[in-house]
UniProtKB/Swiss-Prot annotation:
<dbReference type="InterPro" id="IPR017949">
    <property type="entry name" value="Thaumatin_CS"/>
</dbReference>
<keyword id="KW-0732">Signal</keyword>
<feature type="disulfide bond">
    <location>
        <begin position="78"/>
        <end position="88"/>
    </location>
</feature>
<feature type="disulfide bond">
    <location>
        <begin position="93"/>
        <end position="99"/>
    </location>
</feature>
<feature type="disulfide bond">
    <location>
        <begin position="143"/>
        <end position="215"/>
    </location>
</feature>
<feature type="disulfide bond">
    <location>
        <begin position="171"/>
        <end position="180"/>
    </location>
</feature>
<dbReference type="Pfam" id="PF00314">
    <property type="entry name" value="Thaumatin"/>
</dbReference>
<feature type="signal peptide">
    <location>
        <begin position="1"/>
        <end position="22"/>
    </location>
</feature>
<keyword id="KW-0776">Taste-modifying protein</keyword>
<dbReference type="InterPro" id="IPR001938">
    <property type="entry name" value="Thaumatin"/>
</dbReference>
<feature type="disulfide bond">
    <location>
        <begin position="31"/>
        <end position="226"/>
    </location>
</feature>
<feature type="propeptide" description="Removed in mature form">
    <location>
        <begin position="230"/>
        <end position="235"/>
    </location>
</feature>
<dbReference type="GO" id="GO:0031410">
    <property type="term" value="C:cytoplasmic vesicle"/>
</dbReference>
<comment type="similarity">
    <text>Belongs to the thaumatin family.</text>
</comment>
<protein>
    <recommendedName>
        <fullName>Thaumatin II</fullName>
    </recommendedName>
</protein>
<feature type="disulfide bond">
    <location>
        <begin position="148"/>
        <end position="199"/>
    </location>
</feature>
<feature type="disulfide bond">
    <location>
        <begin position="181"/>
        <end position="186"/>
    </location>
</feature>
Amino acid sequence: MAATTCFFFLFPFLLLLTLSRAATFEIVNRCSYTVWAAASKGDAALDAGGRQLNSGESWTINVEPGTKGGKIWARTDCYFDDSGRGICRTGDCGGLLQCKRFGRPPTTLAEFSLNQYGKDYIDISNIKGFNVPMDFSPTTRGCRGVRCAADIVGQCPAKLKAPGGGCNDACTVFQTSEYCCTTGKCGPTEYSRFFKRLCPDAFSYVLDKPTTVTCPGSSNYRVTFCPTALELEDE
């Protein structure tokens, strides 16, 4: 009886401790080329905000519970000086190595909000285009991962091809309400259908059918760039 009473007394504190723990994100580059990983919540960096990852390297960051609207992405073809200032052909975030804001399209985005009423919400988005294949999966149990690893760049419609590489979203290219959904009312287009056909688990436009995955609060995650390269290597 005493043990049961003690458990019920401690349970709220144990639950609070679990939900107040920072989530661990392991960011892995399995591409054959160097990428510059970035992590931001739009108005501030997440952890250090960015880091160069050569092929096969990884970077682990801690993200505070309650974080909303966090994003992780890869930048390509970057140059930075010793002060951490420079430029990237895709995903550039104001010329900084350590991103404080989101990157410039095209970018494949791993998006998340943590510990929202005890749940985490994760997704991959092509709403800002596509530059690097990606897998976004939990490393703890309780939910599935999502992936967008198709050859979108190779099959990109001519009008969406980005000069610096990658495949732009239609809103970035055409800047119309049809593609940007500025009125709050829009449907799929030929371009969003292109992204959806190749990556059905990823958001293809603002009002896309729900593709968010719900995970237990305080889960840990892994974001892998070029995940199929890892699978081929392991065969």
